[in-house]
Amino acid sequence: MSKKRMSFRVVCCFIALFLILAVSGCGLFIETIPKGEIPGKAPEDRYVMIDHVNYHYLEYPGAGPDIFLLHGFASSTYTWEKVIPYLTGQGYHVWALDMKGAGWSDKPKDTTYDTITLMREVNRWMDVMGLKHVVFAGNSLGGAVALLMTLEHPDKTDKLILIDSAGYPIKRPFVIRLAKMPFAAEIVRLFFGRWVVKRTLKEVFYNDAMVTEEKIDAYFSRLSTENSLYANTALARSLDFDALSSYTKRIPEIKNRTLILWGKDDAWIPLESGYRFSKDLANEKLVILPECGHVPQEEKPEQTAKIMIDFIEGR
């Protein structure tokens, strides 16, 4: 085969790939949502600028105690939207934050996204909001931040609610392992689309029927914001269990009343981690939800909310 014909075929292959990506709504052809814009913004959507980062959060005022809800990896305040009405119905003052790099918050490139840095930034946000002695509920990565906050800033937390929490070494999910590959950010940007979101959600849910078009759209829109893919790749690359080992060794020091809530069929952080938290925490209650995956607050919101409320009220 002549070099001329070979070059022609290579060009044709690139053109074909370009067209396939274009018509499938992948990476380079996805419209980016500018920072600071929230489609369908609600009255509870708020922003605050702290250290040059514009943080998005939700606030639902109430006469009861402050409950602070913190999301996991590649997630946002959206993950709590089905649980919040039950909590506000009890009169609690509910807060939920998009950490730097997540949801509708800014996703700067000139920064780091490791867990300890995120914890320090959450603490700074709580200072600005004037929050202390909150009921701190964290899912996945948010649970790890809750644990670090309890150890480093005990004045910020009262009761703890760990929902399928990160903390102990585990086998990283595929999407996080992918971030360790060379040129991961560029590859993700090229192929990212609704199909990636759908595939990932089906990993974290036990019941595939819960992965609705509305849910896919909610995650996809937030991951389509400016610098989102960069921020999530940087966060995934920075997940370092060795760096956190000095903290996980101190978990037995925590004396806060703690609810450990786990989806029995969690494919991202297995139930073994839930049992380990139960063993290491002195003042804990472990509740396991059958036929439930990594995000009980989305898959079984009514049950999750009832368990949370009973725990908060001491029932």
Protein language model annotation of sequence segments:
Residues 177, 191-252:
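Conserved alpha/beta-hydrolase catalytic His-Asp/Glu region
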Residues 265-269:
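Acidic catalytic loop of the alpha/beta-hydrolase fold
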